[in-house]
Structures are given as structure tokens and as C-alpha cells.
Amino acid sequence: MPKTKAGDHFESLFEYAPISLWEQDYSGIKSFLDKLRASGVANLDTFLNEHPEEIDKTLRLIKVTHVNRETLNLFGAKTEKELLANLDKMFRDEMRAHWRSELTALWNGEFNWSGDGVNYRLDGEALDIRLHWRILPECESTWECVLVAIENITALKQAEKRFRNLFKY
């Protein structure tokens, strides 16, 4: 199907946005959480305390459908294929607590979330990030289309640390 002029415009807005943007599919996470509810799980926090390995399992259920150019730049990838092949290097360690908070929001029926965390570039450099996601209105029943924005706040966090250190002594 040929693209419309408006479609080209919105694709360019996504592709050239000056912030890391991701299109993701959380339908696998929705199925996982729905099955937990159906099995009688009433409290996700209690369940995750008893089964912490499930946090990693749900991370693997995220499907990344597209990222923009700034995402490649931020994470040091040359291509989307390279980036997607290395997600386990980028989202690790401190990310689990961050993701747990996101899972809790999803469990509680929230369609958008924001929070700070740590991701890693492909070269291993840590990035302090502010992550925002929104399940798009047309996908609120399936969670198949989620827009994710990642802002690099490393310089801000370093400045905050220097500021706090000024007043320690």
C-alpha cells in the first residue's frame, strides 16, 4: 500500500526525533499477567518475591518492532539489527528493579509509566536514563503497540552527585 504524505511525515517525526523512541509489543506480557490472574495470583509483588526469575522471563516477552536513529546513537549501535541482537547487554543488572515497577503498573491497569533507571551502551558504558512508555489507545485491549521514549540523564545525575558532594563537608 502506498504511503500517504501524512504517513511519511509522521514516520519522519519518529525516525528523526531527538530522543530515543521505540515501538514495542507487550502482548506477551499481557498474556503472562492474564494467566497469573486466572491462576489465582492476587498480589504481583508477593508472586515476584516468591518467583524472582519471572522478572527476567517477562523481559524476554517484550517484542521490539522498531527503533529510531537516536536510539542507535544513544546505545552505540550501527544498525537496528545489531541493537536488537544485543538487548541483553543493554538491559541488565539495575534494570530488573526498574522493570518490576513497570510490571506492577501494568498489573494495576496503568497504560503509561515513567521512571529513572540504568541501561548500558553496547560498549558497556552505563547510562542513567528516564524512561516513559504509553500503550497507545487503539491497543489498550491487546498491548500490541507501546511507544517508549528513553532520555539520557547521565549528565544530570552526575551534576546532582557533584552538588550533593559539595555539601557533605
Predicted regions and their residues:
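PAS-associated C-terminal
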Residues: 24, 148-151
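Short loop/turn elements at sensory-signaling interfaces that couple input to output
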Residues: 122-126, 131-146
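PAS-family sensory/regulatory domains
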Residues: 69, 73-75, 81-94
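Conserved hydrophobic beta-strand signature of PAS-family and PAS-like sensory domains
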Residues: 30-31, 37, 45-48, 61-65
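PAS-associated C-terminal cap
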Residues: 1-13, 151-165
